[in-house]
Amino acid sequence: APLEPVYPGDNATPEQMAQYAAELRRYINMLTRPRYGKRDRGETLDILEWGSPHAAAPRELSPMDV
């Protein structure tokens, strides 16, 4: 993971604060961006396989569903 930017202090110049704000924004975006990897692959394949013979058969509604 990227390192969190260091706060320049209360006496920092506006340029230093702007630099810190930009680095902090990049850092937060990096931590919160969606990840598309092996774990997501299962969900996307389900959509593609709707018509395949391996798709789960629709089940009857149970009393719990009603």
Curated annotation (Swiss-Prot):
The modification Tyrosine amide is found at residue 36. Residues 60-66 form a propeptide. Coiled coil: none annotated. One of its GO terms (cellular component) is extracellular region. It is found in: Secreted. InterPro entries: Pancreatic_hormone-like, Pancreatic_hormone-like_CS. SMART domains: PAH. Keywords: Amidation, Hormone, Secreted. It comes from the Eukaryota. Pfam families: Hormone_3. Its main location: secreted. PROSITE patterns: PANCREATIC_HORMONE_1, PANCREATIC_HORMONE_2. GO terms for molecular function: hormone activity. Belongs to the NPY family. Gly-Lys-Arg at positions 37 to 39 were included by homology with other pancreatic hormone type precursor sequence. PANTHER family: NEUROPEPTIDE Y/PANCREATIC HORMONE/PEPTIDE YY (PTHR10533), PANCREATIC POLYPEPTIDE PROHORMONE (PTHR10533:SF2). This is Pancreatic polypeptide prohormone.
